[in-house]
């Protein structure tokens, strides 16, 4: 029997502070719940949307009920008895961090049980010897930034100086990351990528999870804008991924859409598709759902929920993007094949109503749809790896070292 798996990951779409949220300073965070509350109270109205949060297709997969189980309250405006077609769970993270890589790796069987390296100082964030080595090896004459910053704010603040000097902008955040912003045309994309590759080699011994190239365009602070040519340089996963097992045991196709390939350092990926906007990510995903061969795993990361709305603390923008995604989700559902398993999940939270600009430690929704799957609550998962283990079960692969299977199909005992 030819099967496919389609994973739609809404980057940062948490559904309530997890039991260890206090350890991360995230008590009270609830990405979905607080967006729904703002919408319900007309605090997220804009030219693009208004009123309660309307996500009928996600509700049908069990989103509201999953959030109810996770946070002990139904998101405002959601139905207690939706027309349920999906099976739903919620999951806590086993990994020691609340970043993109930890969440993604864990769900494919490689939880991060070690500590990443971090740059904790808000200013003068990077050790001088590291900066000196980067300058020496890449022949750059100087740099700007060297601090914690929002990526969109720092190009506003330092972009004009960057154009004068052509010094790259170095910055970080609460995540294990070293980010380099530079003008795509004046500094050059290839130059930026080469700089990031060199920085990645230098930083790898410090267990810095990612170096990210952040190209931008524009002529002044009023029109600087990041482009779609972001590139992530990630440490390779420390354990075998579900992808690799699928390729070895079933000769499967693993199709990355968006930044998935970069997150897994291109390990176990057989096809890659880039996309710039949320609309493009939806378009490419739908195209693959229609055309990808059987025996495929299609995996899309919808990054804009995190980068454009979560970190920027834009509640209305997040709500509008969710409603757009929900409408496009109907197209995906309508084009699934007989033996497709659809999974909808997240990798961490990033509550746009919360203090600061960082990720939030939250439970994630785990929503499944297959024509032979009984709509039901599947319980609380103690690790995101339950997602990968369920996929391994569905595809008939050797089990992962972490996680348990959540799926029980009609006709099974």
UniProtKB/Swiss-Prot annotation:
Cofactor remark from the record:
Binds 2 manganese ions.
Q: Which superkingdom does the taxonomy of this entry point to?
A: Bacteria
Q: Which GO terms describe its biological process?
A: 2-deoxyribose 1-phosphate catabolic process; 5-phosphoribose 1-diphosphate biosynthetic process; metabolic compound salvage; nucleotide metabolic process
Going by the record, the broad EC class of this enzyme is: isomerase
Q: Where does Mn(2+) 1 bind?
A: 11, 347-348
Q: What is its EC number?
A: 5.4.2.7
Residues binding Mn(2+) 2: 306, 311, 359
Entry annotated with the keyword Membrane = no
Q: Which UniProt keywords apply?
A: Cytoplasm, Isomerase, Manganese, Metal-binding
A single Gene Ontology CC annotation of this entry is:
cytosol
User: Has keyword Zinc?
Assistant: no
| GO MF assignments | magnesium ion binding; manganese ion binding; phosphopentomutase activity
Location comes to: Cytoplasm
Q: Which CDD domains match?
A: PPM
Which cofactors does this gene product need?
Mn(2+)
The role this protein plays is: Isomerase that catalyzes the conversion of deoxy-ribose 1-phosphate (dRib-1-P) and ribose 1-phosphate (Rib-1-P) to deoxy-ribose 5-phosphate (dRib-5-P) and ribose 5-phosphate (Rib-5-P), respectively.
Q: Which HAMAP family match?
A: Phosphopentomut
Write out the similarity annotation. Answer: Belongs to the phosphopentomutase family.
Put simply, this protein is called Phosphopentomutase
Q: Which gene encodes it?
A: deoB
């Amino acid at each position: 029997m030819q099967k496919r798996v389609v994973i739609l990951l809404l980057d940062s779409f948490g559904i309530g502070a997890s039991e260890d949220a206090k350890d991360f300073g995230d008590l009270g965070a609830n990405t979905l719940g607080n967006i729904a509350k703002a919408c319900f109270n007309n605090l997220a109205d804009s030219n693009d949307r208004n009123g309660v949060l309307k996500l009928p297709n996600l509700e049908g997969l069990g989103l509201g009920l999953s959030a109810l189980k996770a946070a002990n309250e139904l998101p405002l405006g959601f139905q207690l008895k939706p027309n349920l077609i999906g099976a739903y769970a919620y999951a806590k993270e086993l990994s020691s961090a609340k970043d993109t890589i930890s969440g993604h790796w864990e769900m494919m069987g490689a939880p991060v049980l070690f500590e990443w390296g971090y740059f904790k100082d808000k200013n003068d964030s990077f050790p001088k010897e590291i900066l000196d080595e980067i300058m020496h090896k890449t022949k750059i004459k100087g740099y700007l930034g060297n601090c914690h910053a929002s990526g969109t704010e720092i190009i506003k603040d330092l972009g004009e100086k960057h154009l004068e000097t052509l010094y790259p902008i170095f910055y970080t955040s609460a995540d294990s990351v070293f980010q380099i912003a530079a003008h795509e045309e004046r500094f050059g994309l290839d130059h930026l990528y080469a700089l990031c590759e060199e920085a990645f080699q230098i930083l790898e011994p410090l267990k810095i999870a990612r170096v990210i190239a952040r190209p931008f365009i524009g002529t002044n602070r009023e029109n600087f804008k990041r482009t779609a040519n972001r590139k992530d340089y990630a440490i390779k996963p420390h354990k075998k991924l579900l992808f690799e097992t699928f390729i070895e045991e079933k000769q499967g196709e693993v199709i990355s859409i968006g930044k998935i390939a970069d997150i897994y350092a291109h390990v176990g990926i057989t096809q890659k598709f880039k996309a710039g906007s949320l609309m493009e990510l939806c378009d490419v995903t739908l195209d693959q759902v229609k055309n990808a061969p059987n025996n495929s795993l299609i995996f899309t990361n919808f990054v804009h929920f995190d980068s454009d709305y979560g970190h920027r603390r834009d509640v209305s923008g997040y709500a509008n993007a969710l409603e757009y995604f929900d409408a496009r989700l109907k197209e995906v559902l309508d084009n699934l094949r007989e033996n497709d398993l659809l999974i909808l999940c997240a990798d961490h939270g990033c509550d746009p109503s919360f203090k600061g600009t960082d990720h939030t430690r939250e439970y994630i929704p785990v929503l499944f749809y297959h024509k032979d799957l009984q709509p039901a609550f599947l319980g609380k998962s103690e690790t995101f790896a339950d997602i990968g283990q369920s996929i391994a079960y569905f595809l008939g692969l050797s089990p992962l070292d972490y996680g348990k299977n959540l799926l029980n199909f009609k006709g099974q005992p």
